[in-house]
Swiss-Prot record:
Name under which the protein is recorded: Phosphate-binding protein PstS 3
Ranges annotated as spanning the membrane: none
GO biological process annotation, one example: symbiont-mediated suppression of host innate immune response
The keyword Transcription regulation is assigned to this record: no
UniProt gene name: pstS3
């Protein structure tokens, strides 16, 4: 596998799309099954030799591992992934430009109808990658910062413009915040990360947000940057800035992350595998059958103290039955390896491994892809 970057590299990424690619062409291959690492997960190799997918930048770093595991499980097969945002991932999948799409939000009603026309069968939303959204900031004098939903909403809609605003200071009584102007950085591209973050602001701000949600940033203030890589780089290089990033990008850029005060009470919550795992454990499925859309409202206003509330699930948007069975076979094999051996080590790279109880439900759906 070869990792290509467009634009100048900063840390893990810089501006532009991340492309995961490997040698080979689009010839079809046949093959038997391979047994890979975690829980001796069965991978039914075969079908299209080189898959193509695009979408969510939040899962870009996880895809690096998933492609490596797929190549090991199914020699001669690979996947090219372009991290160009959830909106592009859905659009390119529905336009039959890719074999599946990655999105941090499930298909809308209209998008699902377009996907069914493209597939000739219902499309499924399969949540495969879980990751917290970090609120990151650049204040040299502040190494630990507490924020809550109402205060974040007022920062990101421009109601609070100074770091020493009384609302922020009240959450951080142990030190005096600087009288520095806040510089908001947001995603300029259509983004599932933005949609999830705005859904959190809407749910957790007690009405302070007032801007709605959606893949485009609605706050009306700040500076836009493309992709998780772009917002990470902008925050790192802008004193007084604040933004939202998928956790793995915040880690890679060594950004300082805020602790979040939640509706469950207790101490402000930092991102850890345990704090996010508690949140995922409370999720329910609102989709029907093998369409595993999650009801994430419980994420944003947790009832259990110690649960980190800003969590996104990245869905792989797939055809339940592909017009070309060779594609369906390969997509199924890729996802089998992803939810099997691909889960090992994710926690070291800013992602949360799929809980065992949910993995069995996901495996049933993946194995049904044709």
């Amino acid at each position: 596998m070869k990792l290509n970057r467009f634009g100048a590299a900063v840390g893990v990424l810089a501006a532009g799309a991340l492309v995961l690619s490997a040698c080979g062409n689009d010839d079809n291959v046949t093959g038997g099954g391979a047994t890979t690492g975690q829980a001796s997960a069965k991978v039914d190799c075969g079908g299209k030799k080189t898959l193509k997918a695009s979408g969510s930048t939040a899962q870009a770093n996880a895809m690096t591992r998933f492609v490596n595991v797929f190549e090991q499980a199914c020699p001669g097969q690979t996947l090219n992934y372009t991290a160009n945002g959830s909106g592009a991932g859905i659009s390119e999948f529905n336009g039959n430009q890719t074999d599946f799409g990655g999105s941090d939000v499930p298909l809308s009603k209209d998008e699902a109808a377009a996907a069914q026309r493209r597939c000739g069968s219902p499309a499924w939303n399969l949540p495969v990658v879980f990751g917290p959204i970090a609120v990151t900031y650049n204040l040299n004098s502040v190494s630990s910062l507490n924020l809550d939903g109402p205060t974040l909403a007022k920062i990101f809609n421009g109601s609070i413009t100074q770091w020493n605003n009384p609302a922020i200071q009240a959450l951080n009584r142990d030190f005096t915040l600087p009288g520095e102007r806040i510089h908001v950085v947001f995603r300029s591209d259509e983004s599932g990360t933005t949609d999830n973050f705005q859904r959190y602001l809407q749910a957790a701000s007690n009405g302070a947000w007032g801007k709605g949600a959606g893949k485009s940033f609605q706050g009306g203030v700040g500076e836009g940057a493309r992709g998780n890589d772009g917002t990470s780089a902008a925050a790192k290089n802008t004193p007084g800035s604040i933004t939202y990033n998928e956790w793995s990008f915040a880690q890679a850029q060594h950004l300082t992350m805020a602790n979040i005060v939640t509706s469950a009470g207790g101490d402000p919550v930092a991102i850890t595998i345990d704090s996010v795992g508690q949140t995922i454990a409370g999720a329910t499925i609102s989709g029907v059958g093998n369409d595993l859309v999650l009801d994430t409202d419980s994420f944003y206003r947790p009832k259990r103290p110690g649960s980190y509330p800003i969590v996104l699930a990245t869905y792989e948007i797939v055809c339940s039955k592909y017009p070309d069975s060779q594609v369906g076979t390969a997509v199924k094999a890729f996802l089998q390896s992803t939810i099997g051996a691909g889960q090992s080590g994710l926690g070291d790279n800013g992602y949360i491994p799929i809980p065992d109880e949910f993995k069995s439900r996901l495996s049933t759906a993946v194995n049904a892809i044709a």
